[in-house]
């Protein structure tokens, strides 16, 4: 028996078939180098985190940029985990379905296996964030520990992206199409999250993206509204030499602020005038986001099961 085929389906029950397929996927993790997604994900997380990690959860700008970048890492990891796992063995799935395989057992086994992968990737990502000097939020919003809230969010985002890619893998017929579709899914998640681009009349689309809910959750957990804002000060510094009727009023003001040790007070004041209700550190801003991500997981799972239910009729 090769690792691309399952054990003989001597059990007709869904639970027993679930165990058979889960063991198969675990063997493939070892013998077919599926473990490679872990170091690849770690490298991507390291590249991003070492660039934006120092200011994440320190300033409002750093938190916005850092959480969005971290969410993108999670989405990428999730997509890469499962975008090819079904379509690469589509013929085998079709054959075994005709022999009595339960599609629900097969999909749930994939989901259990992918959950293990996503959990490991979450631990690796948190470790890399720690090494990169990320200042984890100490008090949590949902739990007592901010790092736990952060870990739950990272796991949910990664897993939702993973199951979305699993759904796509069930819909397409080969790995070439799957890898062609994946960049478009990534672009959709990045652009339509609403975090960096003004969507205008299309703003309602952001609620359909995993990245939107993930970034918002991390900003809430990171206590965005309690952090200083530095962009106003940096803008004023750029214009410090601006001449106004032979005077440089901004330069005098900036020098006075620094001389009197009021810079930190100014940055905190700037932050307090840039509060966002959606980022207030309360459970009501986190739990709905987690719920939205879980709902997406349920929808992706349902579509994946339905798609494979009709695999016998697939003439492609």
Question: What role is predicted for each listed range?
Answer:
Residues 1-12:
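Non-transmembrane, juxtamembrane loop and terminal tail segments
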Residues 10, 19, 26-316:
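Membrane-spanning alpha-helical segments of multipass transporters and channels
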